[in-house]
Curated annotation (Swiss-Prot):
Protein name: Probable cyclin-dependent serine/threonine-protein kinase DDB_G0278487
Ranges annotated as biased composition (Acidic residues): 529-555
A family per Pfam: Pkinase
Annotated organism of origin: Dictyostelium discoideum
GO molecular function, one term: cyclin-dependent protein serine/threonine kinase activity
Family: Belongs to the protein kinase superfamily. CMGC Ser/Thr protein kinase family. CDC2/CDKX subfamily.
EC numbers, comma separated: 2.7.11.22
Length: 636
């Protein structure tokens, strides 16, 4: 552009073609998609001067001072400028080139002229043209905001929403009544000022739907594109603008777009999940559309508009359902939408003059601000990620440290447990050893006790043996003493016998015969039976005496024969005894009393004691019981 400083055009062309039309909104609507180009064009444009000559045959730089770039579109860029002398803020839209094939630019200029009577279309202040390069600049009034930039910074109340939305419906209704489809309704193409007025800009894709019936389906920004366009329909009408207006209504109340698809496939899926899946029942012949196979695999979703917007009024939901109807033939028109109770029920819409003012911001500025905010957010996110990574690294280190510490603790615990087990095992071993020692000691004590008991028993046995030996010894001694006494007595008796008269009478009778005589006397005195005598005789004599008796019996016989005059039978002795008793009775004092028979040692009883008969006494017939012979005779 700086090289075109001397080119001029006729003023009639500018005044007749752009007297009441505006296209600054068109540039601002597409600026968000070409931000980098906007920055480069801005630097190039601002660095030079506007050399184009306007209808006054003056240079544009003589009338306007460029301040900043506020938008970028398909056909050109939009700049914020000040009119010199009046300090009036204006918007300059630069069309890069106009060739015979550039139908969009020609149609936009034609539509601006056709729709200049509509108050909701941005008016044209002036136009500057360069015929050699087909470049021209249109001067529009400056609007403080576009709706996208405004919603990015502020949340609107329901009365504000109703005010802006009613103006939008009124403006689009007049455009449709003029037989024109806008085909790019979106928040960035809606311009508002601080007086509360809304204007529709960017007619670059607008076209008349009365002159032809087949159109391109690749129109309207993706987030605001109607489902029939996404399904590939090429026969459509102004109802596509009503779908876009429904999306703008959601954006007005939520300050964000509810259908942000990144591709046509994702956009169709988002529409189906929110508004329901299109079928032939609710939309006849929809399955015949070119791109229907993109949603044929989807389940039949019901509409979720009432669920998602359940916190809003019923009239708002009904209006939204009418605008976002899948079947385009049943979709509300702008005129029908203006009859909605949404605008007559409380809260009522604000009047434009009562709308609050805001700090100026446009979509490019909003985009730049969003980019800056996004960069800040990315930087912040990056810092947070770094911080998070550091925290995670620290956490991992702490976790690793804790794991190592836990391992150390587990190791120490295992060591303590092992040590404890060893100590316990040692204690158990010691306890078992002690028990074993104790058991051995008990066994030893028991053994010692048994041995002691055995020793005691042995000692007792020895003591008893000793006692028995002593007893036997005493008995032996007593026996010997008794034998000695007996021998002494026998000696004494023998001595007495030698001295006794009986011995003189029978001196030649041996001891055996004396014993026989004594036994006969004893048996006679005790009146014992023959059997008793025989038993006593057997008990009385020992074996040696029996042998002596048998050996001496023959000698006695011969001795008795030889000494027959000296042998006196027992009966003779008894007779003599009786005679003596009778003699004593007859002559008691004739002679001195003789000694009793018991004084004779040969008349003593044998070792086995016998009781003397009561009929025999030695007291010369005295019957006194005290003088009876009751003491047994003992032979020593």
């Amino acid at each position: 552009m700086p090289s075109q400083s001397n080119n001029v055009i006729t003023s009639s062309t500018a005044s007749s073609s752009m007297s009441s039309s505006s296209n600054s909104s068109d540039a601002s609507s597409t600026s968000s998609s070409n931000t980098n180009n906007a920055h480069s064009s801005n630097n190039q444009f601002v660095s030079g001067q506007l050399n184009l000559v306007g209808n006054t045959h003056t240079k544009i730089n003589d009338n306007y001072e460029i301040i900043s770039k506020i938008g970028e579109g398909i056909s050109g860029s939009v700049f914020k400028a000040i009119k010199k002398g009046t300090e009036e803020m204006v918007a300059l839209k630069n069309f890069k080139g106009w060739t015979e094939g550039d139908r969009a630019s020609k149609e936009e200029c034609s539509l601006l002229q056709q729709l200049r009577h509509i108050p909701y279309i941005t008016p044209v202040i002036d136009i500057y043209t360069n015929f050699e390069t087909s470049e021209y600049i249109i001067v529009f009034p400056y609007f403080e905001h576009d709706l996208s930039g405004l919603l990015s910074e502020h949340r609107l109340s329901i009365p504000q929403v109703k005010c802006y939305f009613k103006q939008l419906l009124e403006g689009i209704n007049e455009i449709h009544n003029a037989g024109v489809m806008h085909r790019d309704i979106k928040a960035a193409n809606l311009l508002v000022n601080n007086k509360g007025s809304l204007f529709i800009g960017d007619l670059g894709t607008a076209t008349s739907y009365t002159k032809r019936s087949v159109f391109s389906s690749k129109v309207v920004t993706l987030w605001y594109r109607a489902p029939e366009l996404l399904l590939g329909s090429t026969q459509y009408g102004p109802e596509i603008d009503m779908w876009s207006i429904g999306c703008v209504l959601i954006e007005l109340v939520t300050s964000r777009n509810f259908l942000p698809g990144s591709s046509e496939q994702q956009q169709l899926e988002a529409i189906c999940k929110l508004c329901g899946t299109p079928t032939d029942e609710i939309w006849p012949n929809v399955s015949q559309l070119q791109n229907f196979n993109q949603i044929s695999h989807l389940p039949v979703y019901p509409s979720r508009l009432r669920t998602v917007f359940k916190n809003f009024s019923n009239d708002f939901i009904e209006l939204l359902e009418g605008l976002l109807t899948l079947n385009p033939k049943k979709r509300l028109t702008a005129e029908q939408a203006l009859q909605s109770p949404f605008f007559t029920n409380h809260p009522l819409p604000f009047k434009p003059e009562n709308m609050p003012g805001y700090q100026p911001i446009h979509v490019l500025e909003a985009v730049q601000k969003r980019v800056q905010q996004q960069q800040e957010l990315e930087q912040q996110k990056k810092q947070e990620e770094q911080k998070k990574q550091q925290e995670e690294q620290k956490k991992l280190e702490d976790q690793k440290k804790q794991e190592e510490q836990k391992k150390q603790e587990d190791l120490l615990k295992r060591q303590r447990l092992l040590k404890r087990q060893q100590e316990l095992k040692k204690q158990q071993d010691e306890q078992r050893q002690q028990e074993l020692i104790k058991k051995q000691q008990e066994q030893e004590q028991l053994r010692l006790k048994v041995e002691h008991e055995k020793q005691r028993q042995e000692q007792e046995r020895l003591r008893l043996i000793q006692q028995e030996q002593e007893r036997l010894k005493r008995q032996q001694q007593e026996h010997e003493q008794r034998l000695q006494r007996e021998q002494q007595q026998q000696l004494n008796q023998l001595q007495q016998q030698k001295e006794s008269p009986l011995n003189n009478s029978y001196g030649k009778i041996n001891l055996k015969r004396s014993l026989d005589l004594v036994n006969d006397i004893r048996n006679y005195c005790t009146s014992e039976t023959e059997s008793e005598y025989e038993s006593d005789e057997e008990d009385f004599y020992t074996e040696e005496e029996v042998e002596d008796y048998s050996s001496d019996e023959e000698d006695d016989y011969y001795n008795a024969q030889s000494n027959k005059s000296l042998y006196t039978p027992i009966k003779a002795m008894i007779q003599q005894h009786n005679n003596n008793q009778q003699h004593q009775q007859q002559y008691p004092y004739s002679q001195q009393q003789q000694e009793p028979i018991s004084s004779n040692p040969f008349l003593q009883p044998p070792k086995k004691q016998r009781t003397a008969s009561t009929g025999f006494n030695n007291n010369n017939g005295n019957n006194n019981n005290n003088n009876n012979l009751s003491t047994p005779l003992t032979i020593h």
